[in-house]
Amino acid sequence: DPIRNVPKIASKIAVSERTQQRAIKVIKDAEKKRAVSGKDPMGMAASALYIACVLEGEKKTQKDLAEAAGVTEVTVRNRYRGLKEVLNLDV
């Protein structure tokens, strides 16, 4: 479950509670559109957190999120693109 991974990753890179909640909302919205199943939960959580950081103005890179989650930057980038497209996000 990617939602359970959000606090684990967030604690490693010190993001706000507000940003964590935003990431959880991104994941829930993606789940409604069936864009989460079959994807690595850690990669999905990292990408949702990256999107939330951008939206909340927290300066974190894809590399920061990838390292905190133990996934590659390519995974974060691919999930980010997928989420952005499915949710019509302007980030």
Where do the language-model regions lie?
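Short, amphipathic alpha-helical "recognition" segments used to contact nucleic acids or chromatin
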Residues: A45-G57
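A cyclin-like helical interaction fold
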Residues: D1-G43, Y50, K63-A69, E73, ...
